[in-house]
């Protein structure tokens, strides 16, 4: 144990051992570790490339506690020395924060707005700046103070320092005067003596290069040189770029091809363009803006995949696609907290592409679950990292296999063309820095250098106040991937089905007897609006209700599926069951703007135990229901005959669909028997076959065996229920349900005309028919009003959305103005006292100045008076008497000079050099000497 001199050495001595937590330095008594200045050079050697050192300086500007919007990288010539400068418009630093930044291992970065800081070790600036050059000056301002800090190996070598010394000088940002601290004067002297600025004014002039009232500027000189004495960075080849020196020579020496080297390895402009996964700031390299890009959105033939590590609960998105620039640049781009760590990492078939496997494919992944290395150029080689690389290899191989099988090309780099335009085009607004997705495929090279939101062709995203377009989450990607796999399986299953010939009824359907038809009165049917005319009814279910119930259609009553055709008797039962299990029940849409839609009747297929033993020819086809639209005259009393609708006939099914322009009219439902005949079938067969029960059979007619008459179910109960519904709800449950009674009554009237042998009163039926007509007309009016109200509601909703967007815009502008006003306050509240003191001092100085002004005025008056007197005396001197006076004064002056010489010789200590001989001072001195020596007595 090493102790300070004078510290107790015994083990039991008081004060020995480790210090207590919170104790001061006086309680330690143990030597502190020191850091040699040579550590600055050894620490910088962790960066194998100069661009990674530059990335460290850019990371400090991107971190959420700085939030710089613009970074300028430039090369300047100061005193014949090339200097590399980095300037940002961030928050700046106080002298205390600057001291922590120039120290080692101190970091207090926080998470803001779900943005994680990139730096975690507190070492990036030291290692990055010393990797680029030997000396660095930091200029920072935060709205109140200007601070200069020096980190220089040259200075430490000249003063032969034993530790790392960082001179820091603060200045007042208002008057640019140095703030006196205990080390400000020696720090300023050290900076002026050992930096490239030897005057204080030159030092302060560097703050003018920082845009705005806050920001930081880093100036690095003595740029690192190679062994041949040439600068490591090439500033001369490209005036708008910074290149790595002699990269062509290195490639030729290794035997490689120059084009195969990624541009990001030797061009700083290309490196800055992909440094961040989603850039949030503008970078100007040598006074020209860098075209930053989201590399995941700059690929063609993009496919998304997910990776769920076993050591974390979060899924990670992986993006695969083909490069649109150079197919020889391929691999995995691995990011961490939005920052590029490894670029073009070869995995899977890309490691040894014997026949061009994986060439041109780029993968993008953000590995926040991995730990980056100390220099942020690689990840720590752990088990998690190896598992991630293996998973990436498998997924890349699967992507390559899928794309090669789709495109049907040979695995050769020559056979596959390079896509020129990515699948999506994203561009960053130059003002709000938000990313906007442009509709269609647009070549990014055709866009202007400065793009703004109001250039967007999409009207929704033409303002900077509108948030960015939301991307798919990892959960959505998983669902879409699973859905895609299911669609692939379904397509494979449907391929043999499409080759089969769909069968139709070969024999005419049979008519049920009266007794068998009466057994169908216990069945119900529902209707639902169908948007597409190609949608066919495919199934239904039985209802245990004894009569027709006018209710809102329940999802359990019938099921639709637009993906399947009817498969009839000869098809295997297992296939029919599989199709029925895959059917989905669409929900009713009561918010449709049009009140009337096509309505087709779904047919129920109840499957019995022996249903597969009967062929389709043994089944009967009951009356089917379909919409009949009125003509232009709207003659509701005339019922038109329609053709028989067979569910298996494609041409008849298409013929039942009327033109689109008649969709806004009320349909009348007409019941038709499929085929009138006297053939009877077994009742058990009817239960097994498809059926739809819409109308009932009169009891008297059923018992007598007369021809069938169709009447609606429960007419009285239906009328009472409609009256009750209209009393509290003007909108009907369903258009089809409102049309059923009218159509059924029409069928009843026609049935009565055909069966003249019965004595049913026609007058009562006619009254009921007229009443139902009036009810239908009333429902039509109510529906028309409902549509009008819906249109007004939509207009009000659009107006509300418009004013809401305007309110958000004004609110955003208010926030901007309040922020600018807050920034305009040059001094914070803690400086108010200092400002008040300065005001009092200036006020006192003003009072003193006023007093001096008054005194000067009085002296001016006295001088003017004396001048007038002299002018008068001059006039009197011109007379003869004046000439005598002048001669007398001259004699008196000579006499006084002689007396002064005499007094000087007698009294050597007298100083008579500055005495005026025109005044009476010499006379007074002579009188004093004579009186002191008692000569006058």
UniProtKB/Swiss-Prot annotation:
Histone methylation reader which binds to non-methylated (H3K4me0), monomethylated (H3K4me1), dimethylated (H3K4me2) and trimethylated (H3K4me3) 'Lys-4' on histone H3. The order of binding preference is H3K4me3 > H3K4me2 > H3K4me1 > H3K4me0. A zinc finger (CW-type) spans 420-472. InterPro entries: HATPase_C_sf, MORC_ATPase, Morc_S5, Znf_CW. PANTHER family: MORC FAMILY CW-TYPE ZINC FINGER PROTEIN 4, ZINC FINGER CW-TYPE COILED-COIL DOMAIN PROTEIN 3. PROSITE patterns: ZF_CW. It comes from Homo sapiens (Human). GO terms for molecular function: ATP hydrolysis activity; histone H3K4me3 reader activity; methylated histone binding; zinc ion binding. This is MORC family CW-type zinc finger protein 4. It is found in: Nucleus. It comes from the Eukaryota. The lineage of its organism: Eukaryota, Metazoa, Chordata, Craniata, Vertebrata. Its main location: nucleus. Expressed at low levels in normal tissues, with highest expression levels in placenta and testis. Expression is significantly increased in subset of diffuse large B-cell lymphomas. The CW-TYPE zinc finger mediates its binding to trimethylated histone H3K4me3. It holds the Pfam family Morc6_S5. Zn(2+) binds at residues 429, 432, 453, 464. Residues 606-637 are annotated as: Disordered. Residues 762-876 form a coiled coil.
